[in-house]
UniProtKB/Swiss-Prot annotation:
The entry's keywords: Antenna complex, Bile pigment, Chromophore, Electron transport, Membrane, Photosynthesis, Phycobilisome, Thylakoid, Transport
GO biological-process terms attached to the record: photosynthesis
Species this protein is from: Aphanizomenon flos-aquae
Protein name: C-phycocyanin alpha subunit
Family: Belongs to the phycobiliprotein family.
Any one of the GO CC terms: phycobilisome
Length: 108
């Protein structure tokens, strides 16, 4: 997979040199941006999970594999949120309603 980081490393490697300070700073900047993006995504998942659990409180109080009484429930809410987000962002616009309906039906 080609990314700006891998291309910079490949370019420096073919030229037989180390990465320049500018290239290293760009790599660090991209890593920092990726870390911030991941933190924002986790906050969004936490908020969505809280909203689902407050609307459907029985999902956390009833034990069993089909309820969100453990970390798997939070993981699943994050999964459905990503699917809905991908659909709404235009990557698969016609699938957005399908995933949202599926998530709602799964929680009903």
């Amino acid at each position: 997979m080609k990314t700006p980081i891998t291309e910079a490393i490949a370019s420096a490697d073919t030229q037989g040199r180390f990465l320049s300070n500018t290239e290293l700073q760009a790599v660090d900047g991209r890593r920092a941006a990726a870390s911030m993006e991941a933190a924002r995504a986790q906050k969004l998942i936490d908020g969505a999970t809280s909203a689902v659990y407050s609307k459907f409180p029985y999902t956390t109080s009833t034990p069993g594999n089909q309820y969100a009484s453990d970390a798997r429930g939070k993981r699943d809410v994050g999964h459905y949120l990503r699917k809905a987000n991908h659909g709404l962002s235009g990557q698969a616009a016609n699938e957005a309603n399908t995933y949202i309906d599926y998530a709602i039906n799964a929680l009903s």
